[in-house]
């Protein structure tokens, strides 16, 4: 039973791949295309310039994608190595009472809560 499905799928793929070939437009098809889409759009679609433009756009998109990936990778390595400039403000001082002084608890400058006393503020 599985063999019959395999043969059927193989035949289906063969028939579909045969029908999917690109073929140039015949003069009758070109005429109907012009009548449906208009003269300007039909000429644009038929011309080879759109292939050059498409290649140009693809190359620009590829360059932008590579640049974006490159900057992401640099940012990741900078975070890992901690080389990026410190854009955050230092979080020091007491947050209680709105004090703006840089001294920590009890007049001592502390990096973390409880580094001196072991209990915090």
UniProtKB/Swiss-Prot annotation:
InterPro entries: Natr_peptide, Natr_peptide_CS, Natriuretic_peptide_brain. Residues 23-96 form a propeptide. Keywords: Cleavage on pair of basic residues, Disulfide bond, Hormone, Secreted, Signal, Vasoactive. Transmembrane segments: none annotated. It is found in: Secreted. Residues 1-22 form the signal peptide. One of its GO terms (cellular component) is extracellular region. Brain, spinal cord, spleen, heart and fin, and to a lower extent in gill and ovary. Disulfide bonds join 105-121. GO terms for biological process: blood vessel diameter maintenance; cGMP biosynthetic process; receptor guanylyl cyclase signaling pathway. Residues 80-109 are annotated as: Disordered. GO terms for molecular function: hormone activity; hormone receptor binding. The keyword Transferase does not apply. Pfam families: ANP. Belongs to the natriuretic peptide family. PANTHER family: C-TYPE NATRIURETIC PEPTIDE (PTHR12167:SF2). Exhibits natriuretic and vasodepressant activity. Has cGMP-stimulating activity. May help to regulate body fluid homeostasis in a variety of aquatic environments. This is C-type natriuretic peptide 4. It comes from Oryzias latipes.
